[in-house]
């Protein structure tokens, strides 16, 4: 569940489009009728405070971020199958059938596009959510150690 001020900062459509036009976002995308974007100010504030940003982006967001000054390290957590995606969505019991179908189609597109050369630095296969999480944490810890050992 998305939470204001924790996962996202919600603004109305007019405000976000105005911010996008002004160049206040590193990346932005529209997904399932919502507009998502990464604020330059938020990322710069984190960097000034020696914090590392972990972002949850779609494929277009990753592409956009790769074309910035940030030098991001990108990880794709790949489902083992589209059936797995569908099963997880059904188990959540939060979407109607047509919405589940739409999300599965989007997942298929993402899985295909994730193979684009240079887009992701690491791909984790999510055959077991706990194992995938452990792999992600290990990658993050390694990257943090590497960052602080060189800076």
Curated annotation (Swiss-Prot):
Q: Which CDD domains match?
A: GMPK
What keywords were assigned to this record?
A: Kinase, Transferase
UniProt cross-references to Pfam families, sorted A to Z: Guanylate_kin (PF00625)
Q: Which residues form the Guanylate kinase-like domain?
A: 1-141
Against InterPro entries, the record matches this protein to: GK/Ca_channel_bsu (IPR008145), Guanylate_kin-like_dom (IPR008144), P-loop_NTPase (IPR027417)
The entry sums up its family as follows:
Belongs to the guanylate kinase family.
Which protein is depicted? Guanylate kinase homolog
**What species is this protein from?**
Vaccinia virus (strain Western Reserve)
Q: What is the lineage of its organism?
A: Viruses, Varidnaviria, Bamfordvirae, Nucleocytoviricota, Pokkesviricetes
């Amino acid at each position: 569940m998305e939470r204001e001020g924790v996962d996202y900062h919600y603004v109305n459509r007019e405000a976000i489009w105005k911010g996008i036009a002004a160049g206040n976002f590193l990346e932005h995308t529209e997904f399932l009728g919502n507009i998502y974007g990464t604020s330059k100010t938020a990322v710069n504030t984190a960097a000034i405070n020696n914090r590392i940003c972990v972002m949850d982006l779609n494929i277009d967001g990753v592409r956009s971020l790769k074309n910035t000054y940030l030098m991001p390290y990108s990880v794709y957590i790949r489902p083992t199958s589209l059936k797995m995606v569908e099963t997880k969505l059904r188990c959540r019991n939060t979407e109607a059938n047509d919405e589940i179908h739409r999300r599965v189609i989007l997942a298929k597109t993402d899985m295909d596009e994730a193979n684009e050369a240079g887009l992701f630095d690491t791909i984790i296969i999510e055959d077991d959510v706990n194992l995938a999480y452990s792999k992600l944490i290990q990658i993050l810890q390694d990257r943090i150690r590497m960052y602080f050992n060189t800076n």
